[in-house]
């Protein structure tokens, strides 16, 4: 158990070092970008899906790791970008490094696990909702989604209706 905790913490540190590296390189990746945004500190978007749903390892994060990541971001001095401000300032140079937090799909585990933490800590985010599974087993209800929308820290975005795996969809179906 102790080894798991050490590995988990180490993975969080490595993830956030990568995040810091991305900040240092994001404006310099192309000549065109560096021409226009060389003084831009930039915005990095971090996306999450499931919380404490260990049976889905590719899209899950344990809450203790999520909280560690949020604390590291805060301790590094990065601000979380309010999505409404992000939209208004999209094409403007940024004078500070910021994080745009996004949550995909509207899984119930987000509502039960991460939402209380984000609400308590007033961390803004966008929840991209797939509309077809709303209210089904494992997904949030419309009332829960409306609660987040009313919170003034959670913004609702449209993900897709059915969340098809596009590689498997024919051109005609697309």
Task: Label each PLM-derived region with a short phrase.
Residues 3-99:
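N-terminal pre-catalytic segment of deacetylase/amide-hydrolase enzymes
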Residues 41, 46-56, 96-99, 108-113, ...:
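Metal-dependent polysaccharide deacetylase catalytic core of the NodB/CE4 family, i.e.
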Residues 64-71, 75, 112, 116, ...:
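Solvent-exposed, polar/charged alpha-helical surfaces in well-ordered, non-transmembrane soluble domains
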């Amino acid at each position: 158990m102790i080894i798991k905790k050490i590995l988990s913490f180490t993975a969080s540190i490595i993830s956030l070092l990568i995040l810091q590296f991305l900040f240092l390189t994001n404006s310099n990746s192309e000549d065109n970008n560096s021409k226009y945004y060389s003084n831009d500190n930039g915005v990095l978007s971090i996306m999450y899906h499931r919380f404490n749903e260990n049976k889905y390892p590719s899209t899950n994060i344990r809450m203790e790791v999520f909280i560690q990541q949020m604390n590291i971001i805060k301790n590094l001095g990065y601000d979380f970008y309010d999505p409404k401000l992000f939209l208004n300032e999209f094409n403007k140079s940024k004078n500070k490094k910021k994080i745009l937090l996004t949550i995909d799909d509207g899984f119930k585990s987000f509502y039960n696990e991460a939402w209380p933490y984000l609400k308590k800590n007033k961390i803004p985010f966008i929840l991209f909702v797939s509309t077809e599974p709303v209210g089904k087993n494992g997904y949030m209800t419309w009332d829960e989604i409306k609660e987040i929308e009313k919170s003034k820290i959670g913004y609702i975005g449209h993900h897709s209706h059915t969340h098809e795996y596009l590689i498997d969809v024919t051109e005609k179906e697309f």
